[in-house]
């Protein structure tokens, strides 16, 4: 849908990814074992302030940092007080602006505030894909002839910079 094409970034929970898809031909079994939950794709608008709130919440959890799409970068310092840990939050190299509205994609578990990520429930212009699951999106990505290279996977987009 055009709604997905206009998405600026995507966020998912670490616990929603349960395996790695091995190199080579991608099988349906590999996709299902990696993304086993029936989470639908959801798009919504969030302000930069709401995005920062989500990232702060993740930085306060022992294993709950959100996994982010290409172009989004977050650095946080786990030695700082909760709520003040995010030190860098950029999209395509530009700082996330509190007042700017960003069109994001996530899964239905997070969209409903799962894992305590409450700011997702404040999202505007919400659109649930109605039976179109995260696993469907992964399959469609590969069916369209897209690949994932080692180069694309290099570098941490989310990193703890604690000294």
PLM segments and residue spans:
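Feature captures C-terminal
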Residues: 3-163
């Amino acid at each position: 849908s055009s709604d997905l094409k206009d998405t600026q970034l995507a966020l998912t929970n670490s616990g929603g990814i349960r395996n790695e898809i091995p190199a080579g031909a991608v099988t349906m079994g590999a996709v299902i074992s990696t993304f086993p939950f029936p989470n639908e794709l959801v798009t919504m608008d969030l302000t930069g302030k709401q995005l920062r709130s989500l990232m702060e919440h993740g930085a306060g959890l022992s294993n709950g940092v959100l996994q982010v799409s290409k172009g989004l970068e977050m650095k946080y310092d786990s030695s700082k007080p909760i709520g003040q840990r995010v030190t860098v939050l950029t999209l395509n190299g530009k700082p996330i602006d509190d007042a700017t509205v960003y069109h994001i994609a996530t899964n239905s578990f997070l969209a409903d505030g799962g894992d305590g990520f409450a700011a997702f429930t404040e999202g505007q212009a919400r659109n649930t894909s109605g039976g179109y699951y995260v696993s469907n999106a992964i399959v469609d990505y590969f069916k369209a002839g897209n690949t994932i290279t080692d180069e694309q996977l290099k570098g941490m987009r989310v990193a703890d910079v604690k000294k």
